[in-house]
Amino acid sequence: MTLLPPLPPSLRARESDAQSIRPMPVAVAMGDGIGPEIMRASLAVLQAAGAALEIREIALGEAVYRAGHSSGIAPETWEVLRATRLLYKAPITTPQGGGYKSLNVTLRKTLGLFANVRPTGAYAPFVATRHPGMDVVIVRENEEDLYAGIEHRQTDEVYQCLKLVSRPGTEKIVRFAFEHARRNGRRKVSCFTKDNIMKLTDGLFHKTFDAIAKEYPEIATDHWIIDIGAARLASNPKQFDVIVTGNLYGDIISDIAAEIAGSVGLAPSANIGAHGAMFEAIHGSAPPLAGRDVANPSGLLLAGVMMLVHAGQPRMAERVHNAWLRTIEDGVHTADMPQAAPGATRVGTRAFARAVIDRLGLAPRQLPPVRYGEAAPLVAVPEAAPTVRAEKRTVGVDVFLHWSGGTPDNLAALLRPVAGDVELAMITNRGVKVWPQGLAETFCTDHWRCRFLAPGGQALAHTGIAALLLRLAGAGLDFVKTEHLCTFDGVPGFSLGQGQ
């Protein structure tokens, strides 16, 4: 299983032979927990293989958080990342408690690393797995979805997290997945969504996938609802080739895929954007294992292989990857790896790295050796098509209230007299219609969505919405949020209430 073809040529060094490679500037973050141990081991292997690396060590993670930077990265570090355009990162620890933002999400979004490529393969019979022959690439959207990180507490009882999905973001990741499949000779791209429930956001992802698929007639496609898709991935991964999906779903199923293939500790990840890339293992920092020399460096080492291929050092990548495969074949394993063959030896982090170094120049005897020299690069990071502006009309507003004064009928009795020239069309609680004609059995919290519509489908001006809010405030009602209800070329851009 090869991991990744060389990506944007503008970022690549030229490799003709080991002596002529220009050293590749790379920012290296040693990480937290097991991070420093597995990074030292990985760098030792890469450098022993002859990789031309100009390492610029940077501080990220827990120590930076503790120094008062809530993002986990100091301002001056951004300049190093902009200069190198390449980050090799060990796992980091985000301190528990409020006030800290995920550094991984910050890095991916700030640097525009929109594509998260996570290849997963089985190494049977040397690593125990129920699925020998598994070879799946998960392409995860990296910048949007619930990972936008926009959350609010709105009432005593209700918290909110916004799911943001854009047409350009979706188009870029879907096209990236198809280009990856085409240039690596893969036969099928599968799309995972939950558009039977989230018909607008996940519906956009599915529709975009279907539209772009027509441009790649030689590639088979299918679509799965995420729940059954994840179940099928776990039970029969060989039916999948490339999977493209949203941020949250991709995060979850890539761990599932890695675990059923053998171990999460074996799985690498490449985060790709137009202006740079970040390479890391998919697992976390595992603080309880820190300093014990037991962590598996394989995921981070294979991420380093992906980094070398990406940056134009495929021969060095081949040397490392094939030596790693030979090490696995020879039964040199870390403690997390399920053993399939008798006689395998359990070793620590440092000994595993030494074993790989000892096998540099060797190829696996049974597993297929990797060849990166002929891999075709992606010509460019895909660009989204220009946005076609629709005719947008505001036809109503959803006003969300913090209210605990009684029943839905009681609330409607307060709202209707102050509705003015708009009509109270519906009240929902946690998305379920409770007025008109609600059911007494429906459990309600203190968070209410009150839908007001202009009569006869007329347009509703912003001044009309502002006037409505003034009337609600005058009636002593606590509104915590509004959402304008708009049509786009006559098509409603809002969902119905459950039961409406």
Predicted features and spans:
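N-terminal glycine-rich phosphate/adenylate-binding segment common to multiple enzyme folds
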Residues: R66-C161, L248-G250
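Buried hydrophobic positions in well-ordered alpha/beta secondary-structure cores of metabolic enzymes
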Residues: D32-G35, R85, V139, A177, ...
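C-terminal non-catalytic interaction/assembly regions of soluble proteins
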Residues: G361-Q500
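Glycine-rich phosphate/diphosphate-binding loop of Rossmann-like nucleotide-binding domains
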Residues: I21-R22, A27-G50, T155-I226
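N-terminal beta-loop-helix "entrance" segment that forms/cooperates
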Residues: A52-P75, A231-L233
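Glycine-rich phosphate/nucleotide-binding loop
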Residues: L3, V64, P75, P125, ...
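N-terminal phosphate-binding or glycine-rich loops at protein starts, especially the Walker A/P-loop
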Residues: L3-L7, R12, D17-A59, T407, ...
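Flexible, glycine/charged-enriched surface loops at secondary-structure junctions
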Residues: E54-E57, N184-T193, Y216-W224, G312-H321, ...
